[in-house]
Amino acid sequence: CIRDRFENFFSSTDAALSEKGHMFIELLFNDFIRFIGSDYTPLSVEEVTEASIACCVKQEIHGDYAINTYISMDLDTAIAFATRYVHEQFHSYDEYVQASLEDFLNLQNGLFIVNVSNTSNTELTLGAPEHITVSPIQFSGRTLHIPVLYTFGTIDFYMERVSIKE
């Protein structure tokens, strides 16, 4: 059950999350299962101030729950991720692979803001996905690193707090 997996994921960390934070992470795990596959293992969550990246996409969520979200992975993992996501074979990192990462993050965040609107009448908006090339990334707000190990590689997901009013 995704709820059990989710609860176990955070039980051994000091990474306390708000109600919307829990909603976001639970949706993220569900989206990984739905769009990429269930053959993953969540690794330990940690707070970080910076991250080394290779293939990285960022998207901002604006409003009363303002966060920056990042999905990052190495080149080979990005190619395998895109192959699973769009059900089409890729052999090199190109604009289609990058667009797949952007689309997954945009889909995840779009579903999240709809869920927030439906459950709490809070309107959030999304910025456009951005390809990040400067490494390491320096985070200015409290940032959780959520690594997820798939059979084809590790996906690093980051949630950077900007402004949360709850």
Predicted feature locations:
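N-terminal auxiliary interaction/assembly segments of multi-subunit proteins
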Residues: 3-166
